Every structure is written in C-alpha cells, then in structure tokens.
Amino acid sequence: MNPVTVFFVVVVTVAACMILFQVYSIYLNYDNIKEFNAMHSPLEYSKMVNVTAIDRRIQDANDDIYDAKQKWRCVKLDDSYVSLSMFGYKSDGIGIRRFRTLNSCIDYTFSTSTHSSILNPCISPNDPKSRECTFLKSVL
C-alpha cells in the first residue's frame, strides 16, 4: 500500500470511530437528554438572549414574528373569546370573529386561519374611541 492509501484508510477509520463515540455518548445520556428536553419545553416558543427557540415542526401564525405585540393570542372579550394582535382582530368578514371556547379560538387562530380577514377598530373609518379599540389597546 502506498502512503496516500494508508492516509485515507486512517482518516476514514478515525471518522468512523468518532461517529461511533458520538452515538455511544448519546446512548449513555439518552435519559438526561429526555429530561433536559422535558424541562425546557415550556421555552419552546420563547425568545431568549441571542437564542430564538421556534418550533418548526408545526407552522402557525406566530412562527416568524418576534415582537410580542404582533403575536396572535386569544383573549376573553365579554362572554366570548377573540383572536387579536397589534394588527387588530381576526374577522369573519362582517365583524370580529367570536368563539365560545378558548380551544376553538386557539384552533382557528393557529391552524385554520392562515389567510383570514383582520379588522382593526382603531383606524378609520372605525371609531378610535370604541370599546373594541380601547380593549385592543389595553391588552397590548
């Protein structure tokens, strides 16, 4: 065997050993990895210093938004729930879309309504002193 072949055999062997060591290390620490993931799962959608933790497994309306006021949320307005952000309320085409339960609001906001109308009661021709506009400003 010439020196070049020996060199490549050594490099391939070292690379294979490194991969095997990494797999074995993951195998030994698997319980610790699961515990770490379980402990940090509440931070899955949060933004921390120099780190953005975004869940890319499921696409939702807040994935590409970093300003907290722009993020969509479901809040209780009178006897129903509404979906709102700084852009306004999710609309049903006529007025503010209202939901009877929090879960139905969450389901619509983060799965069904990727392209829905938005109603902002704080811009003209709407009244900026309306109850809906005041509520929107108070929530944000």
Curated annotation (Swiss-Prot):
InterPro entries associated with the record: Poxvirus_A28
Cellular localization per UniProt: Virion membrane
A Pfam family this chain is assigned to: Pox_A28
Segments crossing the lipid bilayer: 1-21
Bilayer topology: Single-pass type II membrane protein
Post-translational modification (record): Contains two intramolecular disulfide bonds. They are created by the viral disulfide bond formation pathway, a poxvirus-specific pathway that operates on the cytoplasmic side of the MV membranes.
Keywords associated with the record: Disulfide bond, Fusion of virus membrane with host membrane, Late protein, Membrane, Signal-anchor, Transmembrane, Transmembrane helix, Viral envelope protein, Viral penetration into host cytoplasm, Virion, Virus entry into host cell
Superkingdom classification of source: Viruses
Coiled coil: none
Virion surface side: 22-140
GO biological process, one term: membrane fusion involved in viral entry into host cell
GO cellular component: membrane; viral envelope; virion membrane
Task of the protein: Envelope protein required for virus entry into host cell and for cell-cell fusion (syncytium formation).
Family the UniProt entry places it in: Belongs to the poxviridae A28 protein family.
Protein name: Envelope protein A28 homolog
